[in-house]
């Protein structure tokens, strides 16, 4: 690892023992992955994955205190992943007891630490920090120190920023010292595609399902996707960004994708085209049959496989404003067709606080509320990590939530059928 004079001085402790430990940790981290240098973090804001005050994370709180007490707070303001708790989300007395007394008993204390370290503002808790309403949107080429997998893959792919799939705490350390190790997706070579994925479906593929298929196939490699542009309208508009948000989250969770290129759509694919494809790239063809095969491969891990769903979560990652509006229209229309006025399964739509605030300013907010759908900014995954929640039959159209929890995956159309008409069994 070649360090600059300033970096070496930090490493040697000339700016204090605490900052030296941070630099030493990042250098060791980089050396494990063959990094040749430390490069400056250039984005305006950081984003942290650790937003939950789990009782078991005592070493994290101790480390945070060391940083705060030594004056080594973040050089950037930052957003953080969603909060784990919400009184508006349906839960039993026992679930609440476990949440507050055993799992997230340190939530208030931890949020105080995040405030001292430099969180953007009190409601900057979302996994979709890059939304315009939130304001943490990196520019093309900027170097980041993020770790939330769905945000990293979005920033790399849709925005053209540069960030590795870091871990929690490592993300904060990059902001504290102002540098990250250069390897992997921070390099030109590391951003070359080693897979060509050909989309040969007869209709627009479900974002979460296509992302799952590609993620499980290429794992941590970089795919160059051909044929998806015709289903996305040929440009990177808000609808395409929303699609790629959900698609990317599935590639990152069902596999370990940190970057993908979509021909004629994503910025680097538009700029460099097929020059992004490495020699001897493998080929993966996705057609209707392949998507159906992947869909049917998902295990159902409910204790009672034919149980009636008790809860539906939508918004992992958090929903966009347009998604909230579109789903309001779909739910209202489907309920009308079914002769109902309210959803027949408790349903939660999650989104960033800033997005929800904007949504509340539209006439759609009252329409959705009248259907019985709850909107909030909780992290569905953190809710499902409660052992008592895990036993509940929960449905979702998020392949990330399906992968990490006991929630059962359905397509968007099937979710709509379930929550408005009680159908779509399979």
What are these regions (language model features)?
Residues 1-313, 317-426:
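Non-transmembrane, aqueous-exposed alpha-helical and coiled segments at domain scale
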